[in-house]
Every structure is written in structure tokens, then in C-alpha cells.
Amino acid sequence: MQIKINSLITPFIDTTPRFSWSLPEGNFASQKAYMLTVATDKAFENTVFSTRAETAERANVRCDIALLPHTKYFVRICAELCGGETVTGETYFCTGFMGGEWDAKYITGGDAKKRDAVLPAVYLRREFAAKKPRRAVLYVVGLGYFEAHINGEKVGDDFLSTPFTAYDKNILYRAFDVTEMLAEGENAIGVILGNGFYNCFTEDPWQTNTAPWRDVPKLMLELHMEYEHGTEKLLSDGTWSYVEGPIRFNGIRHGEEYDANFEKEGWDKPGYTGEEKPARYVRNPGARLSLMEMEPIRVIAKYKPVLCRKTENGYLYELAQNIAGVANITFCGKAGARYTVRYTDRLMEDGEPDHESLACFIRNYCFQTDVYTKKSDAPESFHSIFTYHGFQYIEVTGGDCPELCDIEAWALCNDFEKRAEFACSDETVNKIEHLCHASTVSCCMHTLSADAVREKSSWTGDTGLSAEQLLINYNAENLMRKWQQDLRDSMRPGGCMPCIVPSAGWGYSGDLNGPDWCNPMVDVPWNLYTEYGDLAVLRDNYEALCAHVSYITSMSQGYIAEYGLGDWCAPFDGPAISVNMSAYKCPLAVSDTAFYHSAVKMAEKYARLLGFCADAEKYAALASKVKAAFREKFFDAENCTVYGDCQSATAMMVYHGLANEEEIPQLVETLARIIERDGYHPDFGILGCKAVVETLGRYGRADLVLKMLTNPTYPSMKVWLDMGATTLFECWNGGGSRNQHMFSSVSAFFHKYVAGLSAAAPGYRELEFRPALYTELTYASASVNTPYGKAACGFEKQNGKTTVYLTVPADCTGKLYIGETVREFTAGEYAVEV
């Protein structure tokens, strides 16, 4: 039995614990009851909570336990199965401050009065004597990023701690069990601070350098050492010191400059005798402090270059895969040699690396560039720690070119588990699925950023459109819960949201934050509820959703909304600039009003589930008015066409619930005719992409989607593959970013409507099987590790026979839809000939 608390293994938590557990794979016996016990000792002699419940529930089970701060709790769960068998598991979790006060103070090193972009990274240190503790926990607030060391060893194996938030509203602190890192007697702790997004000095269109939270990097730290009798704390305060270190420059959108001549041997160990200066107290940011309950960023894959060649300025190393991360490079030159390492994901027509196309928004300092200066003639290794880059190509200039074997690229991502698989008989479709995955993991760096190169910011529309496939494919529940808090923190009291979140203050005005780009407040909580079955996510976001609906209503005229970004990045000719990327066919009022209607209908759905009956009736009435206004203004009922006469507009009427049930078959036929007229090419941008593939998949025309995506001529995703894509592109013509996830909603389509597997009830307690047997595919399969176990659906055509393969987890049911026939299944594995 695997037990998770708040969807994590043995976590530190600050919130009400949610318990989830799995039964052994292949055991389809129903759970009759469970016994859950929580104690403060491993022998379960000091029990603080115990309950037995006769239920099959085992996902996000909330228990009202009076938890103490800074405490380790042991958990035992015994699941009683209907056949008489019992399955037992044990685990533990630890609490942080639980909202309590910190005794430590914020400190920094260097000139604490200046927000100077070229200040080196801050190296803080403290030596102390201690007995060997029974348990030791290190709590760190490190702004913007930090890396902690104890006795010369790095604490943890993650990168880019602390997560990006609106630092004036919410700061996420970290907790580490460091018991084994402390020695009896003399010890030392060192912390390196980088700028991150907290002290982001980039002059860019998004006002990052004028963020209301911006300040010098700072540290607040408490080390709690627990002994047999009593505890001891080490706090960040005026007794700390700082040293000058080798990271001379660091910027999240720029890179890192490292001069090994400034290394201070032993600075993070006891007995250091080099020069030190007193640390300084600095201003408390004043935000609430929350424990990071989320998978950290780690190295998830490593790649060696597949090619090395000479360029005009140096040597270029090519990877087989476009990634986001860092390069670990060993330099073999002479002492004093200075190397410049530049990263890009594209080449110019002459084969030289293109370092400028995506640097257009960065108006100061370098872009995607690291610099390393050697201190000796011996080999020296380096990787940046306070930035990451998006790249497939690494250009090294200066000194002696490092050998090919001396470069290794490390892909970084929040280290959540992959929970789903998809494959089919069309290798082009499989490659498109890979593009979706590769782009998604490249952009998961504590938020789902729009891209890994140009901006590293989370555009709300992009994230909202990708969230469903992200949550299907990965256990990214905590990442999206965190981002929902970011959304709530960014919302103004009247319901206005920015189009990038977290935002430094940009994106609240103009035609940037319409119902389309603010839709994540509507859909993402529902995606979380669908995938993981926790009603609390709807409750947490309900007030904000209501405010958002009120704001859209205030911006509408006669229940028609028209103030968003629209169907961004539909096919266009020319460079990837805003005037081209916004040249879409779908009228803005059509898409915005469709999203307005969805927001109101979802508010009604939330209200009914949460028991707010009066609200539900209010939103039902408002939805009827929006629907009536849309139909009157945009729908030609006689010809069954939608204003705009394009794929996106037609699909949106169906997808957003603006069509009556009896009209849907004819609208799907209209959509099919438009696609045929367009030569089986997509004419949609990212809004239309999701609406079109969902509509066609739901109503039995997945074949048209596959034909469009795999069309050998422009525009299509097949053309991206022919252009060498290993990640999704931003624009159909290959312009803009070469690693952007915003078209990745097609992955959810593959799972739900090609292989045919989707959740019909929260947490997959009910499953829906809709395999696309009518396509030319000879097989397709999908599986997902649901909260109740593995679910799967697939089909195989062989020797004139078609067999559908199903897996229904214990305590779940499923319905198989083949044409007009519906068959029901209980838990088990099935092979059904159709």
C-alpha cells in the first residue's frame, strides 16, 4: 500500500492533511472500510487520532486532526476488503510552523541598501556547536532563490528554491530533514542567495523590474535541533556573516557569471579562516508564509550532445531533444580562460545559432548566457544554479573548446510522477504526443510558464488550456493548487485578473485579460476536481470565481463580451509579432462571449455542488441570458452556421454549451464541411484548438482531428515534425518560441477520444470509454493511474476483428460507448469483441 499525504510521499505540511492510499495493483476487490490511525511515535502508543469508516473512499480523505507545529506524525491505514482480506500500510509526515511565528530575522550580505543588478550572489554563513540531535529540521525562506549547505554538503537535491509567487502576498518556505547532515561538535551552515524573480532587474514589457515586492535577496532561517530532552534553535540574525563568492552575476532571464578565482575553500564548513563581514538585517517582505507543499524542481533527465561543429564564434553542441534546464560543463583550458556559453533552441538559415529572435523582449544585459572563468589549469566543472535556459543548442566560445564528452545537459522540472500513457498505430500521432509531453515538462518550474526561453512567465490562457492534459498525464495536483493560490492572490477585489500570474503589476488593463485568458479561474479547479476528486478545490476557489463572473458581466454589453486576446496564434504568414499572432478568423466577441457563458455555467455547477442553491439559480438565470444574446447575435439557425464561418467559432458554440442538444449533430456537420473546405488544415489558434478537438472527439469525428494534425502540408503538427520539432511550436509557421505548450490540449484528446479513456465522475469513480474504432488506426491504448488504481482503454484491429481492452479499478465503474450501444462494467479487466 502506498500512502500519500496531501498528494506527497512523507511530506512536510502546514495544512489539513488529506490522506490517499492505493490497493495492490491487480486486486479488484472493493474496499469495505478503513481504519486510519495517527500517532507521534512509530510504535503507535501515543495515538492522537483514530477513526474507522465504512466506505470505499480512499482519495483525499480529510481528517480534522489538531496538529502541533514542528512535529513528526506516524500514519497507519488498514483497508478492509469485501472478501475479508486486509491491506495495511504505514508512513509519516511532519508539520512546519502551522501558521505560528518565526523567531528568526531576515538578513543579507553586501550592500543591503542597493537593488543593483550587478551585485554578486550573496554567500551567508554561520558556525555553531551542537550535540548530535535526535532530529533536525532546517526551515528556509530564501528570496529570490537559495541553495543551502551544511558542513560542505548541499541540502536537498533540488534546483531553484524558492517558488515564484507574488512575494508581497505569499511566500513559500522550505523544510528539510537534516538530521544526518549534522555532526557532534562543530558545524557550519552556508546559504547562497540568488535574485530569481524576487529581485528581477530585467527591463521587459511585463514591468518585472518594478515589481512591488522587489528588494535585495534575503534569508530567514531556523534550524530546529531536537534532543532526548528539549530542543535548540539556530536562527538567522546579526551573528551571521557573509563572504564574497564566485557567482558574480545572476538573472533568471539572463544567465549566470561564475569566476572560480573568487571561490572560498571551506566557506560552508567549520573552521573557515578567510575574510568574513557581518551580515545585515533587512526589511521583512510582510507577506504570509506558507510551507511549500509541492514536488521540488529536480533533474529529470540527462542528455549528451549528439553533434559538435565549429561556428563563426566557437563550437556548437546539439542535443537530440529541446529541453529546459542547465548544462553541466567541464572546462579543460588554462587558468584565467574565460568561456561564454550561450543557449538557443533554433538555428539561422546559414546554420549559425540564433541568439536574437527570442531576446526581443529583454532590453538589458545578456540573454540565455553563462560565463565561466577558470582558476587553474586542471579541469573545472560548472552549472548555473540560479537560472535555467531553454535550449537544444549550446554555443561555447573562448578558451579551449571543451570536448564533447565534457558537456551534459540536465533537464529540469517539478519532479511529479507521470501517471498516464498513450500509444497508437500512427507513429506521427505518437510523435505529436511526445511534443506535448516535452513542452509541458520544459515549462513546469513551480508554475506552468508559457515557454522556457523568452518569458518564463505563466500566461493564464496558455496554462488554462494545457491544465487538463497536464493533470491527466502527470501528478501535478500540487503544482496547480499552488497556481490557483497565485491566481487568487493576483485578483483585484472587483474580480479583475491579470493575464500573467504571478504578475509584477502588468496585464490588468487593455485587451489582455478577457474571459478567455482568465478562464483558468473557471476550468482549472474543475480539472483538479475531475482528476483527483477533492471537492475542496472548488470551495477554495468559489469566492474568486463569483467575483470573476461579476467582473465579466460588468465588462459586457447586452451580455456580449469583447475585450480579450482572442484565438491567439491561428495560422498566419510572416514573423511572430502581435499583429500577426492576433490575426485570427474567429471574431473576438464570439470567443469571449462563449467563455463568458462557460464561466457562468461553471459558477452554477460549483454552487450546486457546494450547496449554495440561491447562487445556483442566479447563475442559471444569467447563463440563459448570455446564451440567448449569443444565439441572437451570432447564430444563423436556418443555415446552422456561426458568425465568423470558421472552425473555432463553430466548435465554440458546441463546446461552450451554447447549442441546443438537437442542433449539435448539424453543427458538427457544419464544422466538418468547413474543415474539408480548408483542405483538412487547422484554421484555429489555441482557443479554437481545444474547442475543435474536443467537439469532434466527443461527437464521433476524431478522424477529422487526426487528419488535420497529421496533414503533410502546412499548417499542421506534422509540418512541425518535418521542421525538426522535438517540442511544440508557438506558431504554425515555426515562428516565435520553439518550446511552448499552449497547443498541448491535443494530448487530452488522444487519451479521451482516440484511445477513449476519461473520467465521468470526480476521481475516476466512474469511467467513460469512447475508443475511436471508426478511424484508420489499427490500435490505440491509454492508461492512467487514477486515485483508485490503474484504468485503461484501448483497441486492436486484427484479422477482421476488433477487440476493446478495458481496465476498471476497484470501487469504480465504467461505460463503454460503441455507436448507439452502451455497456456497463464493474471493477476488473476485460477484452470485448465488437
What spans do the regions from the language model cover?
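Active-site acid/base region of carbohydrate-active enzymes
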Residues: 145, 235-244, 403-435, 441, ...
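Non-catalytic C-terminal accessory modules of carbohydrate-active enzymes
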Residues: 213-222, 232-267, 290-294, 298-301, ...
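Non-transmembrane amphipathic alpha-helical segments
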Residues: 525, 597-600, 604
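Extracellular/oxidizing-compartment recognition motifs
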Residues: 1-72, 76-454, 462, 478-481, ...
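Alpha-helical support elements that line or immediately flank enzyme active sites
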Residues: 136-140, 150, 326-345, 383-386, ...
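C-terminal capping/lid segments that line or modulate ligand- or cofactor-binding pockets
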Residues: 189, 259-263, 455, 473, ...
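Active/binding-pocket-proximal capping segment
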Residues: 146, 155-157, 162, 487, ...
